[in-house]
Amino acid sequence: MDIKSLIRNIPDFPKPGIVFRDITTLLGHPEGLRYTIDTLTQKCIELNLRPDYVIGMESRGFLFGVPLAYQLGAGFIPVRKPGKLPAAVHTIEYDLEYGSDKLEIHQDAVADHHRVLIVDDLIATGGTARATADLLAKIGCEVLGFAFIIELKDLGGRQKLPDLPIITLVDY
């Protein structure tokens, strides 16, 4: 199935010159959504990625991370922006092109012996995915790899990530 045809392209959003890759059309297509999750699952199995937890990056990583975790027999844990999680958190600050940002995960969500797979809808510059991996490594988790639906190849995000398996289904 060609899931690229199910992803809507919105020019000049959120600002002029940017083409936004809108996955809501993929999510709304039952066969496309099933194919996407089944394909991610199959690729994880082929690469022998057997996580204890799938880590979903805020917020579209939640949409693909939960069903993937279910398919892999793993738990699901969200990594969120500051102030979104109610209990004690581990935090990492990371640099953006202009400034910095933070990510958080509950302190009791994972431990140093857990094997994790990081999931998001898209990899662009790789900064957020790298920060998520660094946060989990700081806790002591074993990061097994990454899974994304879309890769924006010209932005070079893959090069910022650790030398681990990276699954992508569509590239632009």
Swiss-Prot record:
Enzyme category, top tier: transferase
Major localization class: cytoplasm
Keywords, comma-separated and alphabetical: Cytoplasm, Glycosyltransferase, Purine salvage, Transferase
Classification via InterPro entries: Ade_phspho_trans, PRibTrfase_dom, PRTase-like, UPRTase/APRTase
EC numbers on record: 2.4.2.7
Pathway: Purine metabolism; AMP biosynthesis via salvage pathway; AMP from adenine: step 1/1
Molecular function in Gene Ontology: adenine binding; adenine phosphoribosyltransferase activity; AMP binding
A GO BP annotation: AMP salvage
SUPFAM superfamilies hit by this protein: PRTase-like (SSF53271)
Domain of life, source organism: Bacteria
Catalysed reaction, written as an equation: AMP + diphosphate = 5-phospho-alpha-D-ribose 1-diphosphate + adenine
PROSITE patterns, A to Z: PUR_PYR_PR_TRANSFER
Any one of the GO CC terms: cytoplasm
Subcellular location per the Swiss-Prot or TrEMBL entry: Cytoplasm
Cysteines paired by S-S bonds: none
Subunit structure: Homodimer.
Family: Belongs to the purine/pyrimidine phosphoribosyltransferase family.
UniProt cross-references to HAMAP family, sorted A to Z: Aden_phosphoribosyltr
Family annotation (PANTHER family): ADENINE PHOSPHORIBOSYLTRANSFERASE
Primary role: Catalyzes a salvage reaction resulting in the formation of AMP, that is energically less costly than de novo synthesis.
Protein name per its UniProtKB record: Adenine phosphoribosyltransferase
